[in-house]
């Protein structure tokens, strides 16, 4: 079978926020084709791979991606045409070398990732394998706990509600992914009713979660617990809670500005707040509890809570092996958030996950707030056996598509599928 790359074509499409992004088609000599589209974040880490934007204010307020598209259709195509799509690492490393920068700013992380993912899809198609099996082999059968972001704050809610960006539920007590998805959907709808009864807006944010104008951050947890119970489930043993404060968004001059509560706190005071919540509520995961460059604060956080809950670094690590290695060496967390577009290739994404595993850390795959209907992260999650992922609320087509892909994968695996459940998290 001829799995050499014959053609690559990129185009500018829209993401779930109506902003331009890159979509790439890769066609092989055997006729197999792979298509991938690239997401975009709102609360981006300062150390992420660069998303190349045109900055032409006459188009899409400067957010066009025609330069990235052109880079795929010219320079990248010319370099990888004729290469074997099965040689994923070789192709990815060639694109990294071709770009020549540490942050993929010349060709664009969005251009490179689009090609990287489309190549993998084309190769899987040529071999007549589902993507998760192509990437993970026969042993890939661990279904993840879905982390449903059902209540939004921070930048995702235009700073109209809680300071903390995401309040999630994790149905660890379910027996399968299919059951976990049902539990999550039921709690989501109960939360809508709870909010409506309390006189709050039930409009949804970028990731499908509700974005009520709450007075206190803890109100979000109280409302979610009420919704879990009203749906007929037990907080803790059946459904746990995860929080992503996205603390870099309210960190300034060494202090954390809790706008909704009208106070500024230092790292230790914020850690004390988290500790009191872990004592009081069934919290299993805390992501980006402190700012991306507050390394000394993270050490204190890990010392306080690292043996009780999973502490995930997102902006702290940006899926970058150099930053993850520093985190392991300095003992600042116990898990890594994995976003392929933070680093820019499938090969580097897998390396980040493997580095986390090597340190007995957790790895949680994630979507971005500006998404597409590309479901590659679902296949990647099962392929790498990460056991948990977050991809928004069970609402909005671009979020639900990932969850539906997991249903297909679980069905495809049949009796071989097993649900990560309570073992999903490091604790």
Swiss-Prot record:
Magnesium as UniProt keyword: yes
GO cellular component terms given for this protein: cell surface; extracellular region; phosphopyruvate hydratase complex
Documented EC number(s): 4.2.1.11
Binding-site residues for Mg(2+), renumbered to this chain: 244, 287, 314
CDD domains from the UniProt entry: enolase
Pathway: Carbohydrate degradation; glycolysis; pyruvate from D-glyceraldehyde 3-phosphate: step 4/5
Purpose: Catalyzes the reversible conversion of 2-phosphoglycerate (2-PG) into phosphoenolpyruvate (PEP). It is essential for the degradation of carbohydrates via glycolysis.
Protein name: Enolase 2
Underlying gene: eno2
């Amino acid at each position: 079978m001829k799995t050499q790359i014959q053609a690559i074509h990129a185009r500018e499409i829209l993401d779930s926020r109506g902003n331009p992004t890159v979509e790439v088609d890769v066609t092989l000599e055997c006729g197999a084709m792979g298509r991938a589209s690239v997401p975009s974040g709102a609360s981006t880490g300062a150390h992420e791979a660069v998303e190349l934007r045109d900055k032409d204010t006459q188009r899409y307020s400067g957010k066009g991606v025609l330069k990235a598209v052109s880079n795929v259709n010219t320079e990248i195509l010319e370099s990888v045409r004729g290469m074997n799509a099965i040689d994923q690492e070789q192709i990815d490393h060639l694109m990294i070398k071709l770009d020549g920068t540490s942050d993929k700013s010349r060709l664009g992380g969005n251009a490179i990732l689009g090609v990287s993912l489309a190549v993998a899809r084309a190769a899987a198609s040529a071999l007549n394998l589902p993507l998760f099996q192509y990437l993970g082999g026969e042993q890939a059968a661990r279904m993840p706990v879905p982390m449903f972001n059902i209540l939004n704050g921070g930048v995702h809610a235009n700073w109209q509600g809680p300071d903390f960006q995401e309040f999630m539920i994790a149905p660890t007590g379910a027996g399968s992914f299919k059951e976990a998805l049902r539990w999550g959907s039921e709690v989501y709808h109960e939360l809508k009713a709870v909010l409506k009864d309390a006189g709050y807006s039930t409009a949804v944010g970028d990731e499908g979660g509700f974005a009520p104008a709450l007075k206190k951050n803890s109100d979000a947890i109280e409302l979610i617990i009420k919704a879990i119970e009203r749906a007929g489930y037990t907080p803790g043993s059946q459904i746990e809670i995860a929080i992503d404060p996205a603390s870099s968004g309210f960190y300034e001059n060494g202090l954390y500005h809790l706008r909704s509560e009208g106070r500024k706190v230092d790292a230790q005071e914020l850690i004390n707040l988290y500790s009191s919540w872990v004592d009081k509520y069934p919290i299993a995961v805390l992501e980006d509890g402190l700012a991306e460059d507050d390394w000394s604060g993270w050490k204190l956080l890990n010392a306080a809570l690292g043996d009780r809950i999973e502490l995930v670094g997102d902006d702290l690590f940006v899926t970058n092996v150099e930053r993850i290695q520093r985190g392991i060496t300095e003992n600042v967390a116990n898990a890594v958030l994995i976003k392929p577009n933070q680093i820019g290739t499938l090969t580097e994404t897998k390396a980040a996950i493997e580095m986390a595993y090597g340190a007995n850390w957790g790895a949680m795959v994630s979507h971005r707030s500006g998404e597409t209907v590309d479901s590659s992260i679902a296949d990647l999650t099962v392929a790498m056996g990460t056991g948990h992922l977050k991809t928004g609320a069970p609402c909005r087509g671009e979020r639900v598509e990932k969850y539906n892909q997991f249903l297909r994968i679980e069905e495809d695996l049949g009796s071989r599928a097993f649900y990560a459940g309570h073992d999903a998290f490091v604790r």
